[in-house]
Amino acid sequence: MQVSLMANFIELKEATTNPDYGCPPAERDIEAHISMGVVNLDKPSGPTSHQVDSWVRDMLHVEKVGHGGTLDPKVTGVLPLGIDRATRVMQLLLEAPKEYVCLMRVHREVDEERIREVLGEFQGKIFQIPPLKSAVKRDLRVRTIYRVDILEVDGQDVLFRIACEAGTYVRKYCHDVGEALGAGAHMAELRRTAVGPFTEEGLVTLHDLKDAYQFWVEDGDETFLRECILPMEFAVGHLPRVVILDSAVDAICHGADLARGGIAGLDDNIAWGDTVAIMTLKGELVGVGEASMSALDIAAADGGLVIETRKVFMEPGTYPRMWR
C-alpha cells in the first residue's frame, strides 16, 4: 500500500496496487504534471483574479486556468490556480476555510483594550449582510469566525489575522466592528494567507512561474517548474480521505457510488454528510463523494454503499474495468 498511513487513518484491509495502471502524482511526466497541476500563486495588487488566470494560461501555453476563491483587485496573497484538467478541482476550495491578515483603520482614537474586547466578541457565529458591491444576493447570513489574533495596534490602525468560514466578507467585518466601537472603521488593506491547504508557505509569484517555464522550454530543466506547479491532489488536502482498491477505481470513474468492499482504508474523522476525497492506493485523486455514514460506521459495516460519488476527476479507463 503506497498511501502514507497517518495516525488517524483506519486500514480496513491489506492491499497492493498494480504498477501497470495509473501513476503516483509525483511520477507523472512533465506534460501530465502541468495539465493536472495547481499553483499556489501570490497574487499582486492591481489585476483581477480573472486577469491573473489569463496571464498564467498564456504564460504556460495551456487551454484553461481557473482560480479557487476570487480576490478583489487590490487584495494580495494566496490565489490557488488550477490548470487544464485541474480547473474543476478549484470548485472544492470555494467552501474551504480562509485566513487573512487585515489592516483595519478606526475612524477616531479608541482605547486599545476596548478594541481587543470588541474583536474578541466578534468571534464564533456572526451575522453578516454582503456589502453593496458584492456579487451575491444581500440576504442576512450566518458566518463562523474561527479565530482573530491582534498582531499590532498603532493609534487608529489595527493589524489582525482572521480565520473564517468561506463567504465571510472581511470588509463588512471591519465595518461592523467599527459600529460596535462607536467610532466607525474600514478595511484599509487585506492579504489572504490561506485557502484550505494553500498557505503562504511555498507561494509562487508570476515571475517565478514564468522563469520556471522558460527553464524547462529553453534548457529542458523541469526541476523548478515541478516546484512551482503542484499535483492537483494537493488541492484536496483539507478533505478527509477514502482510499480505494484498484478494482473499484473504474466504477467510480463511471459515476458509481462506493461500496464498503471497495475501500482499503479511510480517515477516522469522517462524519455523516462530509465531503471526502476518493483516492487510489497510489495517491491519485479519483473524485469526491458524500459520506453516507461516519468512518467508524463504515469500518463496522458488512457491506453496502457508503459513499455517494459527487464529482469524478480521473479519466475512465485509467484502471481496468473490474465491475459488471
From Swiss-Prot:
Does the entry annotate any disulfide bonds, and if so which pairs?
none
Residue ranges of domain PUA in the record: 239-314
| Pfam families assigned to the protein according to its UniProt record, in alphabetical order | DKCLD, PUA, TruB_C_2, TruB_N
- Where are the catalytic residues? D72
Q: Which reaction does it catalyse?
A: uridine(55) in tRNA = pseudouridine(55) in tRNA
TM segments?
none
Tell me the keywords, alphabetical order.
Isomerase, tRNA processing
- Taxonomic superkingdom: Archaea
GO biological process terms, semicolon-separated? box H/ACA sno(s)RNA 3'-end processing; mRNA pseudouridine synthesis; rRNA pseudouridine synthesis; snRNA pseudouridine synthesis; tRNA pseudouridine synthesis
Q: EC annotation? A: 5.4.99.25
Instruction: Kindly indicate whether the keyword Isomerase belongs to this entry.
Output: yes
What terms describe the molecular function in GO for this protein? RNA binding; tRNA pseudouridine(55) synthase activity
Q: Which family does it belong to?
A: Belongs to the pseudouridine synthase TruB family. Type 2 subfamily.
Q: What does this protein do?
A: Could be responsible for synthesis of pseudouridine from uracil-55 in the psi GC loop of transfer RNAs.
Protein name, as recorded: Probable tRNA pseudouridine synthase B
The organism of origin for this protein: Methanothermobacter thermautotrophicus (strain ATCC 29096 / DSM 1053 / JCM 10044 / NBRC 100330 / Delta H)
